[in-house]
């Protein structure tokens, strides 16, 4: 979730700074993790499909990943008991049990068959992957995230192997006696990096080299920004060096936009234990909470059911996105659903409500026949608060520029909050529609309109909608 929200916001901000941006995604659609789900479905699925189960395809496949892990752990536990009874130490018994687990051996055999192009395995793989892709598409659409191109590891890893062999021929890499291919990065202060295993199978680095090659061929890029968690910092340091060695001009300027882990009050999000915090469930929970909170505060009064549902969606997703994006991406963070949906403080709903409040002012002004001028009327004596608001609005372009230079969506988020906070103080302290001086009234309405415009632009850069009424 944090990955997609950060990547989407970053793409918007970089584009707003005048750059042509291509949004791509890589799906790891091959490997042992896929085979685990496939094998579990084959053994325990009884032909279950998304249609027969009523589940999203990605959820169903995820369930079988969890199923594999549960059966595997039970198998390892049973084998460990057997080996310890034979006199082995706990660590020895565990290592032997994991190595000899029939279930894991079957998964590895399935992977070998996949690599060899076995028709039955490939058919099962295509079917289950299509379930996952359909589920992903639904989630991305709801999240408001899109891509110009999606790459699949199954199509890129061979390109990577080809590029590694090319590097080997040119003397950039070396081969060990077991046939594995390595890069010697000691001159760069790093270690030796495996690029191809002795049996010729690829590693993650191989796939990333292949994907980079395809991106470079598909688009006239001069910079690549990878949005990946901070546990991969070393990986991307190495990838940058390898791409440079292989002749990609932008290799040295590769940017790893590294971000920290998101935790919930209960703990980190996990997958193998069956305690995953699903993005779809989280979005649904946020929308439901937004509706409940908005109703309690009377913010949905007078709206049709359809309008109320749309406001709940906008507020719920806005709360989720803003809470994540306001934090410096490099830091670990704890996501608190209740705190994020508060209509007061540094939250998405507070900003959205202020925007809706300004739209209400502008509607009433229009109903009164007031036309907002393009320029501020002359001869108006401005207060310090009004001058401050004008300056904050004028600062928006510089803020967007800074956010682009620093690759920091949080700069936009916190600027927008500060602007809204100042406007609310202004709204509280000064009459707008009831101001007796007509020129001052028109000025304050125009100022309100400009604040609303900047709030909308800022939130849109973060991928957040703002409602016209609430």
Regions found by a protein language model. Give the residues of each.
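NTP-dependent nucleotidyl-transfer catalytic core
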Residues: 1-470
């Amino acid at each position: 979730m944090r990955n997609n929200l950060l990547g989407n916001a970053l793409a918007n901000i970089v584009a707003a700074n005048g750059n042509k941006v291509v949004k791509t995604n890589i799906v790891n659609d091959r490997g042992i993790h896929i085979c685990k789900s496939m094998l579990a479905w084959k053994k325990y699925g009884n032909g279950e499909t998304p249609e027969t189960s009523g589940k999203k395809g990605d959820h169903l496949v995820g369930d079988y990943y969890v199923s594999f892990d549960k059966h595997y752990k039970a198998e390892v536990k049973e084998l460990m008991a057997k080996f310890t009874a034979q006199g082995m130490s706990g660590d020895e018994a565990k290592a032997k049990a994991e190595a000899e687990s029939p279930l894991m051996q079957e998964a590895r055999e399935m992977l070998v068959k996949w690599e060899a192009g076995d028709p039955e395995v490939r058919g099962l793989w295509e079917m289950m992957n299509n379930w996952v892709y359909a589920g992903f598409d639904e989630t991305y659409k709801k999240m408001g995230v899109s891509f110009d191109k999606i790459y699949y590891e199954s199509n890129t890893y061979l390109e990577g192997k080809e590029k590694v062999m090319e590097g080997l021929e040119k003397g950039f890499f070396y081969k060990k006696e077991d046939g594995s291919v390595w890069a010697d990065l000691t001159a760069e202060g790093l270690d030796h990096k495996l690029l191809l295993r002795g049996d010729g199978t690829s590693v993650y680095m191989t796939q990333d080299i292949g994907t980079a090659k395809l991106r470079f061929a598909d688009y006239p890029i001069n910079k690549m920004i990878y949005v990946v968690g901070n546990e991969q910092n070393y990986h991307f340091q190495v990838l940058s060096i390898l791409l440079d060695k292989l002749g990609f001009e932008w290799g040295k300027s590769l940017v790893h936009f590294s971000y920290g882990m998101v935790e919930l009050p209960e703990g980190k999000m996990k997958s193998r234990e069956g305690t995953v915090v699903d993005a779809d469930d989280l979005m649904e929970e946020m929308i439901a909470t937004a509706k409940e909170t908005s109703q309690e505060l009377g913010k949905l009064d007078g709206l049709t059911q359809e309008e109320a549902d749309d406001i709940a969606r906008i507020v719920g997703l806005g709360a989720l996105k803003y809470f994540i994006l306001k934090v410096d991406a490099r830091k670990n963070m704890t996501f608190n659903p209740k705190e994020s949906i508060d209509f007061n403080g540094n939250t998405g709903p507070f900003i959205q409500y202020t925007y809706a409040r300004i739209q209400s002012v502008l509607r009433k002004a229009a109903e009164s026949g007031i036309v907002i001028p393009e320029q501020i009327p002359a001869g108006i004596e401005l207060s310090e608060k009004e001058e401050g608001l004008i300056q904050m609005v004028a600062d928006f372009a510089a803020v967007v520029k800074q956010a682009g230079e620093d690759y920091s969506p949080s700069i936009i988020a916190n600027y927008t909050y500060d602007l809204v906070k100042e406007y609310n103080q202004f709204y509280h302290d000064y009459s707008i529609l009831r101001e007796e001086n007509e020129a001052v009234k028109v000025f304050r309405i125009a100022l309100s309109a400009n604040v609303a415009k900047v709030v909308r632009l800022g939130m849109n850069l973060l991928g957040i909608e703002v409602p016209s009424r609430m």
